[in-house]
């Protein structure tokens, strides 16, 4: 789901939108192929009898299906004008950004459990609390996005299922 300013620039050149640009907040850099992903899984021991995850498993994360990132981005470019992004009747133009996400969070431990159940993994998941957890919470406020008419449709459970089915095929 690696959209960049370049995509926004191309979209603008096509004269569809002229007043918005899109930038990813975080995610895969867009260059990984299936072989690289599998080698990373192997490198970190995800093919063995146990998986060691850094931290306590308590941090909360939000996940968005990649195609929905694309869908939301196109929706914004086609349906949202810059003036829709700030409060009317004020001379201040503030808080004009639009967060794209689900607004729903899950702990790393719960996500690991979900993946274990989906994949029927028989090994053990071990949390190494001597390693850092990272930021304890990463959640986007999607209230503006919802007010503008776009909502995600694929929850984390369905996303994990779809990803695993893709991997198997």
Kindly label every feature range from the protein language model:
Residues 1-11:
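Single conserved hydrophobic/aromatic residue that forms the stacking wall/gate
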